[in-house]
């Protein structure tokens, strides 16, 4: 994880009806737009600053945003439980949710329209890769290319989904009474479990980055909603 403190960007809200999507347009205005779609539980600040700079130096205009229910974007009121919905997912019982990944893809289109961008490249990470697949499938004329990072092309199921150890760590993220330090410890355990083996994530830099993301947006309730949309 990297907390992106890159300077010189334009930021604001793309608005439609009761929905507000918070974005950062890193520029330059004359660059070729690249839409960055973050994954499950991630904020726009998670995109590495060196990646932003490399894109800019290569003539591109990176644009990142917070998915709904994440970061500074609109929050939805429903409060689903992790365990009951995971059991439905595991038993192949239909899951109800307030919106779908298709709606999250429409949020990205709304942002492009707001910024008057007719066509761009798109890069999606994890759940953002799933959202981006829907984007390019439904709006092929709006994208030059599509890059998928650490994602998949189908809905995960109990045979190819996360291990029970990862599921347990994800479930802990739904605990509302966790302290900031407990949340930082949990992030270290999660990234150590799913990240590159042998790499030490429990560093002062990483812990500071997680702490900054918590300070930016202290509400983790949208994480469960997003996870349900992947299971649905």
Residue map of PLM features:
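Flexible "cap/lid" loop of the alpha/beta hydrolase fold
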Residues: 146-178
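N-terminal cap/lid segment of alpha/beta-hydrolase-fold proteins
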Residues: 2-20
